[in-house]
Amino acid sequence: MDFDMDLAKQKNNDNPVYYVQYAYTRMYNILHKEGTPEFTPVEHYDLLTDSKEIELTKQIAEFPKKVEEAAKHRAVNRICNYCYDLAKLFHSYYNSSRVNDPSNPQLTNQRLGLVEATMITMKNALDLIGVSAPEKM
């Protein structure tokens, strides 16, 4: 395995660690931004019908399986790849969807729930590989 020290020092999306941490920071800031309503857990997330929301939900659901596979095969790189894939899906979702839609509070609440679930999953994955999950970058 080759380690590119110059790439590791870069603070841009070319650096995969920065890319993943930036996704986490973005999630954190969405949930803590002034004027954002507080997420209230709901029983059903039936308003999350966008294809990117469904992809993100499926990726979150894969996390326990990915952890089990990584442990079974002693392949921590699988968690690294999972983090990158989750970040990629989240960035794509963020760039195409408006999480906080004041005209539709129920949809906003469900989207905030999706962001929170993604953030918790990312934090757990980063903890497993010893990478920090910064609230600010």
Predicted regions and their residues:
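Non-catalytic interaction-recognition regions
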Residues: 1-137
